[in-house]
Amino acid sequence: MSQQAEKWDQRFTALDCIDAQASTVLTENSHLLPSRGRALDLASGLGGNAIHLARAGLEVSAIDLSSIAMTKLSIYAEQQQLTISCCCRDLENEAEQQSDGLDENAFDVIVVSHYLYRPLLPSLLRALRPRGLLFYQTFTQQRIGVSGPSNSAYRLAENELLRHCEGLHILLYREDGLQGDTAQGFRNQAMVIAQRP
């Protein structure tokens, strides 16, 4: 087991799926979701996004590095009769081996929140079906306070998320940065909803 897997297993040991929250980009824009189809919740954790997607009628695949999180989510999904398939995978290691295992044209919806591994992004976009939607939200370099990862490699540069979505139709983009009254607004993060042509 990798150090990263151990770290996340420790974090999820004391937490429960019932407390898992879906990301802002998803909850505020659920009206864009298809009524059925396949969805991927990448870096799922305890499955806030996966649970939200399944309750919206989608067949969900949840992938995370933490076996603890995936076990808890699998049990919760079964108890709640939600269509969520859980898989514990180290996608970063798989991407380094050039075999991330994300099939092309596999998903109608892909949701990623609070996770960034740049080498995986091209495969992620190819995994979208035509007209498929990407909901992505994660931390930015510009921040107020100390929220998010301390390692800047896990934070987006200004407009970086937009650049990664080049060739997709942008339905929504938000990155408030340090503009205006920093006590209000969507701070420390960027979000995008993009559709594959």
Mark where each language-model region is.
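Conserved class I S-adenosyl-L-methionine
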Residues: 1-34, 36-45
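Conserved SAM-binding loop of SAM-dependent methyltransferases across substrates and taxa
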Residues: 46-58
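Conserved SAM-binding motif I beta-strand of class I
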Residues: 59-64
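Conserved SAM/SAH-binding beta-strand->alpha-helix loop
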Residues: 66-68
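Conserved SAM-binding strand-loop segment of SAM-dependent methyltransferases
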Residues: 80-94
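A short acidic, Gly/Pro-enriched loop at the edge of an enzyme's catalytic core
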Residues: 97-108
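Conserved beta-strand signature within the Rossmann-like core of class I S-adenosyl-L-methionine
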Residues: 132-139
